[in-house]
Design a protein with these regions (language model features):
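Structured alpha/beta or helical-core interaction and ligand-binding surfaces enriched in interleaved
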Residues: 1-163
Length: 163
């Protein structure tokens, strides 16, 4: 199972944006919002997670363009980061969604020096972690696509995004 998440020393927060909803997964499904697969009843952990709140940025077609589910280190035993706060992240599959993630990171970096993006395969032990660092002003949608597309099972990947 692949797992993607963000890590920070500052809690992941909603920004004042009328298009960002903080909503329970089951309420989003009931409202007919078009959600990422991991938020739908067909996903294996939906029944367990349906009452959890998620943050969604909704576009003009009622599609969820960006989804974040926040949690703290105590709630996650597989995190490789030393940061205190985490948010589950699902791959952003279009340039528009990648740009939305970049803007979210830019906003979050107003409150902290860096955010880590992680991509790993749950299960095996790893000897090393592939690491890269990028300044937020230099981060492009293509960088995110490459980060996620070039993943292998051999080692987790971490991209540290800095101010």
């Amino acid at each position: 199972l692949f797992f993607q998440y963000m890590a920070s020393n500052t809690p992941f927060q909603d920004k004042k944006d009328e298009n960002i909803l903080n909503i329970r997964m089951r309420d989003a499904v009931e409202q007919g919002l078009k959600l990422p697969d991991w938020c739908t009843p067909e996903f294996y952990s939906y029944e367990h997670n349906k009452n959890q709140r998620i943050k969604l940025k909704i576009d003009e077609n009622n599609n969820a363009t960006f989804a974040v589910r926040s949690f703290e280190k105590d709630d996650a035993d597989i995190m490789d980061s030393n940061k205190a706060y985490f948010a589950s992240l699902r791959w952003i599959d279009t340039e528009e969604k990648a740009e939305s993630l970049i803007q979210y990171l830019r906003n979050h970096l107003q409150f902290t020096d860096e955010v880590e993006l992680w991509f790993l395969y749950q299960g095996p032990e790893y000897d090393q972690i592939e690491c890269e660092t990028v300044q937020i002003d230099e981060l492009r949608a293509d960088d995110l696509k490459e980060f996620y597309d070039d993943f292998t099972l051999d080692s987790p990947r971490r991209m540290t995004v800095c101010r």
